Amino acid sequence: ENTATVVVDERTDNGDGNFNYNFQTSNGIEDTKTGTPGSQGQSNMQGTFRFLLPDGTTAEVRYVADEFGYRPESPLLPVGPELPPHVHELLRIAEEQRAQGITFE
């Protein structure tokens, strides 16, 4: 469809960093998200967006965006290999050192 119309446009913003957003168009595009204030001064968001693929099926991506970055989830997205066990141990040690105030330059 070359011309889409907005069929739903709902927005709630409490003015304190909390918000809700819901948007839908006549050609199958949907976007919903919820936002809350983050611990680092950022906005934390979680939501879902959907759109129609050329074969008529719906693509869906769920996501979280916060102080740890943007983390989308969808069966359409490629997934990398699992980290080896020793990397998980190194990350745990680094987190302990960070909590103790140890830094490396």
Swiss-Prot record:
One of its GO terms (cellular component) is chitin-based extracellular matrix. The keyword Transmembrane helix does not apply. The keyword Glycoprotein does not apply. GO terms for molecular function: structural constituent of chitin-based larval cuticle. It holds the Pfam family Chitin_bind_4. Residues 16-81 form the Chitin-binding type R&R domain. This is Cuticle protein AM1159.
